[in-house]
Amino acid sequence: MSGVRMRHWPGNPERPGLALHCMLASGSYWAGIAGRLDGRIDLRAFDLPGHGQSDDWSPAPDGPDYHTAVTRIAASFIDRPVDLIGHSLGGTVALRLAVAAPEAIRSLTLIEPVLFAAARDDEQRALHEQMGELIAAGHSDQAARVFMAIWGAQGYDDLPPRMQQHMRDRISLIAENSPALSDDRANILRPGGLESITAPVLIISGQDSPPVVHAIAEALAARLPDVGRASVPGARHMLPITHADQVAG
């Protein structure tokens, strides 16, 4: 697909895999996990629009929202049953794909899928409202600082200036995705949706991640027919990077 940077870590051609990354990052961070999988799957990962080496996100007035656009891009790379892996926002896209086409999923690995609608959390909703207000007021640096304090591998002020600029330029995408994540605009949680996923599902969480992460995992697991859960000791939200060995298993 034009304008989308695809990355590839060759492996078993009979086990195609697709990995979907989180916001404010790129598909390159799957390299650590791909290396530890030692070719067990043929893994691909694309940079989300506005991230990494993909084109900037430029929504059309009558076009899809960001979450829908990412879902369509991901679906375009699936032509047979796939081992689907998603982290954070990528996890919600993976879950959306699995609900829409369960027959296309060989296995589903969800690493802290941030589908906040699955576990209503007043603190998290207040955080999203605060970030929206900061962004609307033009305080992108403070919005990025608030976001990274909870979800980042390190604090905003610990990042080099180039990375801080990267965060500021893209932080508005966090607010833009709030309806998809907090209100389930894609209707992922519709009756019978999660229950239709017949592939084995593994939900991985960082032990030290925000409480809402564990509440979401519990709510999703309660409805999935074939599900396992794993908690990585000492890990937080960016565990695919900080704890690649444990995540790869």
Question: Which stretches of residues belong to each language-model region?
Answer:
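Glycine-rich His-Gly loop
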Residues: 19-22, 88, 206
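Conserved serine/cysteine hydrolase catalytic core
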Residues: 163-223, 228-231
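Active-site loop/oxyanion-hole signature of alpha/beta-hydrolase fold enzymes
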Residues: 35, 44-85, 89, 249
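Catalytic histidine-centered segment of alpha/beta-hydrolase-like enzymes
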Residues: 232-245
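Conserved alpha/beta-hydrolase catalytic His-Asp/Glu region
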Residues: 122, 139-178
